[in-house]
Amino acid sequence: MPRKGENKERKDAKRELLISVAVKVFARKGFHASKMQDIADEAGIGKGTIYEYFKTKDELFLAVYDKWMDDYEAAMNKAVESHSNPITTADAIIDTAIEFYETHAEHAAILLEFWAHALRSDDTHFLERICQMKSKLAEIGSSITKKLIKLKAFTEVDVESFARLELGISDGIFLQWILDGKSYPLRDAYKFRQSVIGAGLMTTGFRKVMSVKTNKRLKEGFIKKKKK
């Protein structure tokens, strides 16, 4: 007879499977056009089995976003904990964001649908989850910025305003990359953005140290130029 621990492991594994299958269906058909039966068919199970784990399609949709954000937050925390220098920490955070967006590039429509659904839905859990994650990212960004200011790498700046602006820029770069057909490396776009922001916020002394790398990026850009 299976023990309670084994039953929980099986249930957790089944739940993860259903989330993975739901991602495929939502990506293919869109959230609103997808039915629980579609997900059941894709998973090769009865529709009733899904309801043992998720009461509604909305609950399953939220579980998909939760899974992605939990993984993203864990990766961000790991990046912060692995570095003591704020400069290398900032680089690690950017690398983590790039990796997340590249991993979920094919699911961009789901992310956009989630944001749109959060604004329309009467269920406040959707918008609360987005705000929760954004607040966490803003907290990390603020902490790093404060350390860069203390290190005299950055000039004085309103930390909270800058952290919020960074969140919008980050999402915007990802969206523009998708709209541009992923025609350039996302990493190059992020590094260019890093140079633009750095050029404005770096102290005079630190700007001199970083000038060769920063100026090179600013001149080259990230969009491949057509040969004349």
What is each model feature region?
Residues 1-13, 205-228:
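N-terminal intrinsically disordered/low-complexity leader segments
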Residues 14, 57, 64, 68-72, ...:
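Hydrophobic/aromatic residues within well-ordered alpha-helical segments
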Residues 17, 21, 25-59, 63:
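Helix-turn-helix
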Residues 63, 67, 77-107, 162-166, ...:
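Hydrophobic alpha-helical connector segments
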Residues 99-103, 117, 143, 147, ...:
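Amphipathic C-terminal alpha-helical segment
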Residues 102-127, 175:
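Amphipathic alpha-helical segments used for helix-helix packing
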Residues 124-151, 161-164, 191:
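Amphipathic alpha-helical packing segments from all-alpha helical-bundle domains
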